[in-house]
Curated annotation (Swiss-Prot):
PANTHER family: EXODEOXYRIBONUCLEASE 7 SMALL SUBUNIT (PTHR34137:SF1). Its main location: cytoplasm. It comes from Ruegeria sp. (strain TM1040) (Silicibacter sp.). One of its GO terms (cellular component) is cytosol. SUPFAM superfamilies: XseB-like (SSF116842). One of its GO terms (molecular function) is exodeoxyribonuclease VII activity. It holds the Pfam family Exonuc_VII_S. Bidirectionally degrades single-stranded DNA into large acid-insoluble oligonucleotides, which are then degraded further into small acid-soluble oligonucleotides. One of its GO terms (biological process) is DNA catabolic process. This is Exodeoxyribonuclease 7 small subunit. It is found in: Cytoplasm.
């Protein structure tokens, strides 16, 4: 088996691609039980990584401030709203 990249080191895109591969393998149903359990655990970690990255991106977008013309002028702390 190849060495797996730690989930916490993955970009959103890489984690999403691997999550799709894991789901495909599990849906095919041709994986041994022990391997299925490992895949499921890996998939759960990948899902959490993707959710965390999406939340972080949403927070950045929510913090963008606009001027009177609707142009971005910077960011503000999330709790300043």
């Amino acid at each position: 088996m190849t060495t797996e990249t730690p989930v916490e080191e993955m970009s959103f895109e890489t984690a999403m691609q691997e999550l799709e591969r894991v789901v495909d393998q599990l849906e095919r149903g041709d994986v041994a039980l022990d391997a299925s359990i490992s895949l499921y655990e890996r998939g759960a970690a990948l899902k959490k990584r993707c959710e965390d990255e999406l939340k972080r991106a949403e927070e950045k977008v929510a913090a963008i401030t606009l001027d009177a013309n609707g142009q971005p002028t910077g960011t503000q702390p999330l709790d300043a709203g």
